[in-house]
């Protein structure tokens, strides 16, 4: 079976000239459909940089990086956009639009992707909000939600269009244990039912048991645990 993500010998640099610094050193990794891979390691070790490269949010400088069978090194902007449309992103910052309710923030992802008719948007948004324990908060504005609730809305927004790959950067950082486990279990169910792999950056040892593999990055080098 072809891996959803295949990374071979990826190097990445920040800066120019004498200030150029290597962030990733020869990273190689395959992620199979439905596999959950956790990335751990100290801050500044390159975890988030690798995540954004896989998500076609940053240009691949050296090495090979294939997602859904498409090579991202040297890829045209149109191909990168097509790859991004098939990915669900969950970042540390929820980035909710303050003038939209929780439900409307989730619906917006469906409008942007055009994956359903307008009539089905509300039902899908309410269903995924209920799955993350926010059915009663669906029509509330972000300003009235706690930090943990806002993050759960962001997770719902990433999951609502049934992505083929989930990239998550510290998705449980602002959640208590119960809420964090609820959210990662939802992501795990999607991974196993839909064959949707997850690459998740975390410092949260409480969620290690959901992983198929746990890898560590130190000084830009990928290490097995």
Each predicted region: which residue ranges?
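ABC ATPase NBD coupling module
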Residues: 18, 72-88
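Helix-to-loop junction immediately C-terminal to a conserved catalytic motif
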Residues: 55
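Conserved ABC transporter NBD signature motif
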Residues: 63-71
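Short coil-to-helix segment of the ABC ATPase nucleotide-binding domain corresponding to the Q-loop/switch region
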Residues: 100-109
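Conserved ABC ATPase signature
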Residues: 141-145, 149
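Conserved catalytic motifs of ABC-family nucleotide-binding domains
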Residues: 162
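Catalytic Walker B motif of ABC-type/P-loop ATPase nucleotide-binding domains
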Residues: 166-169
């Amino acid at each position: 079976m072809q891996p959803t993500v295949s990374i071979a010998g990826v190097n990445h640099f920040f800066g120019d000239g004498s200030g150029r610094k290597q962030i990733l050193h020869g990273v190689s990794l395959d992620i199979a459909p439905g596999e959950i891979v956790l990335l751990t390691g100290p801050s500044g070790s390159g975890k988030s940089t690798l995540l954004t490269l896989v998500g076609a949010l940053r240009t691949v400088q050296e090495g090979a990086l294939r997602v859904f069978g498409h090579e991202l090194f040297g890829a045209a902007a149109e191909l990168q956009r097509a790859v991004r449309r098939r990915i669900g992103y969950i970042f540390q910052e929820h980035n909710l639009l303050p003038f939209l309710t929780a439900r409307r923030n989730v619906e917006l992802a469906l409008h942007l992707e055009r994956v359903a008719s307008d009539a089905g948007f509300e039902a899908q948004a309410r269903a995924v909000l209920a799955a993350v324990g926010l059915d009663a908060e669906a029509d509330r504005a972000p300003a009235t939600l706690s930090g943990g609730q806002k993050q759960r809305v962001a997770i719902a927004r990433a999951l609502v269009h049934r992505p083929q790959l989930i990239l998550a950067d510290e998705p449980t950082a602002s959640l208590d244990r119960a809420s964090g486990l609820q959210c990662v279990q939802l992501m795990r169910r999607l991974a196993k039912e839909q064959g949707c792999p997850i690459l998740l950056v975390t410092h949260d040892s409480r969620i290690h048991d959901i992983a198929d593999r746990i890898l560590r990055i130190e000084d830009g080098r990928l290490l097995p645990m």
